[in-house]
């Protein structure tokens, strides 16, 4: 009997030892999984996260590092001939030079001619209500201030032609010094209209350059615009001759409704 009891106790101890070791292994495995899970849920420092999420290259905006013709999907109409000045000549390459810009003011007589008030009869108004000065009036004011031949418009870039637009940069030079730089633009509807559009582009640049000389500065004054439209202009309901659509347009009080409206 003693031997039998000893065997049973030994077997129980063996089973208990085996069961305990199994429990320990399970607990140990569970602890390692919990540690592994906790480690994976740890939020990295802000600097580490930023470094990990930072792209390898800087994201550029559309059109970055592109020429204007590439951005507009246009083509260059011609390659301008650049005049290279030599050390022995006084010739200036106006395509790249900024000679005389802001160096000295013009005479009082010239300034008075440039800043004189516009004649109300010279100002026109578009059907949408935008008032403007015709391009030929700008040329007359420049001729009065600097004299014929005392000023000129020189190109500063190539002529860029897109599917619907012609654009080019010009500089206004008066009495041998640069005054202003502006980019002209003009729409066109067919290829046969490109030559005319290039002239319209030049005229548009001239009018923009004249803003720096103070010519017609009141055209950008909201108070003057309201007063001029109230005194010299009116709105009328008209009908388009072709489409028969009715709309309201602006025109001067001394003008009649013209085609294509009636």
UniProtKB/Swiss-Prot annotation:
It comes from the Eukaryota. Its main location: mitochondrion. GO terms for molecular function: single-stranded DNA binding. GO terms for cellular component: mitochondrial chromosome. Coiled coil: none annotated. GO terms for biological process: interstrand cross-link repair; mitochondrial genome maintenance; recombinational repair. It is found in: Mitochondrion matrix, Mitochondrion nucleoid. Keywords: DNA damage, DNA repair, DNA-binding, Mitochondrion, Mitochondrion nucleoid, Transit peptide. PANTHER family: MITOCHONDRIAL GENOME MAINTENANCE PROTEIN MGM101 (PTHR31404:SF0). Performs an essential function in the repair of oxidatively damaged mtDNA that is required for the maintenance of the mitochondrial genome. Binds to DNA. Belongs to the MGM101 family. This is Mitochondrial genome maintenance protein MGM101. It comes from Kluyveromyces lactis (strain ATCC 8585 / CBS 2359 / DSM 70799 / NBRC 1267 / NRRL Y-1140 / WM37).
């Amino acid at each position: 009997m003693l031997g039998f009891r000893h065997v049973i106790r030994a077997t129980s101890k063996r089973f208990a030892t085996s069961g305990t070791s199994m429990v320990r292994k399970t607990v140990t495995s569970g602890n390692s999984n919990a540690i592994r899970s906790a480690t994976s849920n740890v939020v990295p420092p802000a600097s580490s996260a930023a470094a990990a999420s930072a792209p390898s290259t800087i994201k550029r905006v559309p059109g970055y590092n592109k020429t204007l013709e590439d951005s507009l999907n246009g083509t260059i109409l011609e390659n301008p001939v650049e005049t290279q000045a030599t050390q022995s000549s006084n010739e200036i390459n106006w395509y790249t030079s900024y000679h005389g810009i802001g160096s000295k003011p013009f005479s009082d007589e010239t300034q008075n001619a440039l800043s004189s008030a516009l004649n109300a009869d010279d100002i026109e108004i578009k059907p949408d209500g935008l008032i403007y000065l015709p391009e030929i009036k700008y040329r007359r004011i420049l001729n009065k201030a600097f004299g014929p031949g005392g000023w000129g418009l020189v190109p500063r870039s190539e002529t860029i032609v897109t599917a619907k637009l012609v654009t080019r940069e010009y500089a206004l030079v008066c009495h041998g010094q640069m005054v202003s730089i502006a980019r002209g633009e003009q729409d066109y509807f067919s290829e046969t209209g490109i030559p005319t559009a290039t002239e319209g582009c030049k005229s548009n640049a001239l009018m923009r350059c004249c803003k720096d000389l103070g010519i017609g500065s009141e055209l950008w004054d909201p108070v003057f615009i309201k007063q001029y439209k109230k005194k010299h202009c009116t709105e009328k309901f008209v009908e388009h001759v072709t489409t028969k659509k009715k709309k309201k347009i602006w025109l001067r009080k001394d003008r009649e409704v013209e085609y294509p409206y009636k």
